[in-house]
Amino acid sequence: MSISDDISPVPPAPVSEPNAGQDAGQDAAPAHMAARAEALRDQLNYHSHRYYVLDDAEISDAEYDALFRELQDIEAEWPSLRTPDSPTHRVGDTVVAALETQAHTLRMYSLDNAFSAEEWDGFIQRMLRAEPDAPTAFWCDPKMDGLALEVIYENGVFTTALTRGDGEKGEIVTTAMRTVRNLPLRLHGEGPHPARLEVRGEVVITRAEFDALNAARRGAGEKLFANPRNAAAGSVRQLDASVTAGRPLRFLAYGVGQVVWPAETSDGAASAAQGPEARWATHGQVMAALADYGFGTPPDARRCETPAQVMAYYEDLGRRRSELPFDIDGVVAKLDDLSAQAALGYTARAPRWAIALKFPAHQATTRLEHIAIQVGRTGVLTPVAELAPVAVGGVTVSRATLHNEDEIRAKDLRVGDMVVVQRAGDVIPEVVRPLVDQRPASGLPEFEFPAECPVCHTPVRREPGEAAWRCVNVGCPAVVRQSIIHFVSKAGLDIQGVGRRWVELLVDRGKVTSPADLFGLDKQTLLAFERMGPKLAENFIAAFDTARTGATLNRLICALGIRHVGEQTARTLAAHFADLDALGAAQAETLQQLPDIGPEVAASIRAFFANEGNRALLERLRGVGLWPVRPVRPEADAAGAPGEGSGPLAGLRVLFTGSLTTLTRSDAERRAVAAGANILGSVSKKLDLLVVGDKPGSKLDKATKLGIRVLREQEFLDLLEGRGGDVPEDGDGAPGNEDEAPEVSADVPAAPEVLADAPAAISADASSGVAPGVSGGPDRADMTDRTVRTDSVDAPAMPRKKDQHSLL
């Protein structure tokens, strides 16, 4: 099946035979050999384009290989003839030491999402309010589920490839992308080409090629990829380009970034204009030009003249999504008129002229075989459904979080039930409901939540008003393991290069039983581990030293994992207490005088410092020199200065709860602070505004009882952008009450394969202190198993009601 509109590039002239008897020892390549190399490059690039982009090969593989080997031989004899656009770069003979980053010239924005027809209508209305005369024709294409990437061309030659990264800067993956067969190394077609062209798109793998890739890995005894997206991402981010070259990757272009045109056009007229709109009027024209330049483009893309046609396209594509060669999770609709795009501009995170219309979640039916219990770093016991493996939207799902006991009771889930499973937002596995009519006539027993921790067998406790049961033993092996992982994480001390798997390995081997042990590790101890080389061991020790000497008080407070104390509360505490001695001596009454600390948080802080084991840990940290005495520097943490400025949330005290779909919790808090808000850590009468995501839990109940105003996530974003008017009255727009979401969330498909020195995944055993069938905490790679190809369920028409956002 062709993956782009059929275009017919003019084939290069046939390659002539070389002259016999040429002296290969000359330093300078003879002119006729240089001409031959150029002809070979043109011929190979032409046939690669016909094969990989147009699916219309003109020569056999053997003929192509003969031309390719001939060019390799010429370049080996005369290296000066190897040009940047030579097809021989695609063999991937380069290894880079590490992936460096580079800033994008123009930011790569995210897209806002629409999950219902009403949200699509709301997007249109917001757009027309901002620009009443904007045309409403849209360019629509499938939302490819791959790795977003930017490829850069200077004077028609490919020079740089960057991952999307955080939108501001991305990782440089130029060497790997040179091996992607359908990516033009030199722009095709007649000029003039842009002097600089930034092309944006997705790196994808077809489902058929993904199945073949996993079959080969299975035969070789290698770990299987979870899904095509993870395979694509892991392949592009390889340090060894020869690995990338062996993967069936394709780059599909969906737009452009910066475009700089030559100073003069082909007819000699001066042209100082820059940007795509200097030569193209519509996005459709941009896509046609990219196809002419030699790029593959998303299949089934089209122009829709009205918003109603967009919805018809969305519903049609949803019904046919299983017929497409690639995984997709929705439709991207972009205003087709480029001048209207420029007039509408961007919000802080997304264009105002484009949106992603997401498909409803895939669903499937399977059996609930067991309910296992995970123990997290604060002792939370999280039930996890162990399922008979089932294909859901192209991924085999065998586990899904059940959040807490109340959710099990509310859904009446029982071991042995046939259940409906979905991937919310096509990503997060979720058990939707049991099929009660399929239970045996004799019935099934209700699930009994354990009365003791399955790891250390300490009695568990559930506090009034909370949804979670907790192990209260701070020495529980599972709690210790997860606490150390949190200690080194980005939310803790952010110890660079020391990831979750290394911590698990250190704990499992008994080398680390406390965060303080990390700072006593020496090179000899580290070198005893497989795949730990001298340089990596030195990097680890240097990272621990940097954390020990450079940690700020607020980071250490957060790293300690005090219950209810997150990043913002840690900043508040660090700004008011000189060191941990002063904080530990503070009485509850003193703590409650601080801006975001109520009785519950104050009691938790007091309980932490009263615990004998915690006091022993603090003394050990003091002994290794990890004892910051300075408050967080305002210039180093500007986001921590709450309540300042004149933004839309100026002076308001805000709290977030539930699972946010478009932002991380940290990003949401930073944006709220930038808008003038003060972030609180718990619900109290001091709170002005509660922002709720999915499964907001008991915080919503408390806020409702206290008459605190509530906003949905999208309403919060609208308010930040000046689109939402005033903060709504009490409870307006709040979703239905749900139990407190536990700290262990539903897991997503396995992360891309490890790129640098890192150990293989560590399985739980007796040495880890984790009971059989029980995890010492969430391993996001475990929730979704290996991918199998499956035909997806036809997507129904988008519902006409205002649904809560699914997790992405």
UniProtKB/Swiss-Prot annotation:
Gene designation: ligA
Family that this chain belongs to: Belongs to the NAD-dependent DNA ligase family. LigA subfamily.
Pfam families for the chain: BRCT, DNA_ligase_aden, DNA_ligase_OB, DNA_ligase_ZBD, HHH_2, HHH_5, Nlig-Ia
GO molecular function: DNA binding; DNA ligase (NAD+) activity; metal ion binding
Active-site positions on this chain: 143 (n6-amp-lysine intermediate)
Region (Disordered): 1-30, 720-808
PANTHER family found in the cross-reference section: CHROMOSOME TRANSMISSION FIDELITY FACTOR 18, DNA LIGASE
Positions of Zn(2+) binding: 453, 456, 471, 476
Organism: Nitratidesulfovibrio vulgaris (strain DSM 19637 / Miyazaki F)
Signal peptide: none
Reactions that this protein is recorded to catalyse: NAD(+) + (deoxyribonucleotide)n-3'-hydroxyl + 5'-phospho-(deoxyribonucleotide)m = (deoxyribonucleotide)n+m + AMP + beta-nicotinamide D-nucleotide
Any Gene Ontology biological process: DNA repair
Compositional bias of kind Low complexity: 18-30, 746-773
Gene3D superfamilies, per the entry: 5' to 3' exonuclease, C-terminal subdomain, 6.20.10.30, BRCT domain, DNA ligase/mRNA capping enzyme, Helix hairpin bin, Nucleic acid-binding proteins
Assigned GO CC terms: cytosol
Binding site for NAD(+): 61-65, 110-111, 141, 164, 202, 334, 358
Protein name per UniProt: DNA ligase
Record domain BRCT: where: 644-733
CDD domains: BRCT_DNA_ligase_like, LIGANc
SMART domains hit by this protein: BRCT, HhH1, LIGANc
Co-factor(s): Mg(2+); Mn(2+)
Composition skew (Basic and acidic residues), residue ranges: 779-792
NCBIfam families listed in its UniProt record: dnlj, PRK07956.1
Keywords attached to this entry: DNA damage, DNA repair, DNA replication, Ligase, Magnesium, Manganese, Metal-binding, NAD, Zinc
High-level lineage: Bacteria, Pseudomonadati, Thermodesulfobacteriota, Desulfovibrionia, Desulfovibrionales
Listed InterPro entries: BRCT_dom, BRCT_dom_sf, DisA/LigA_HHH, DNA_ligase, DNA_ligase_CS, DNAligase_adenylation, DNAligase_N, Hlx-hairpin-Hlx_DNA-bd_motif
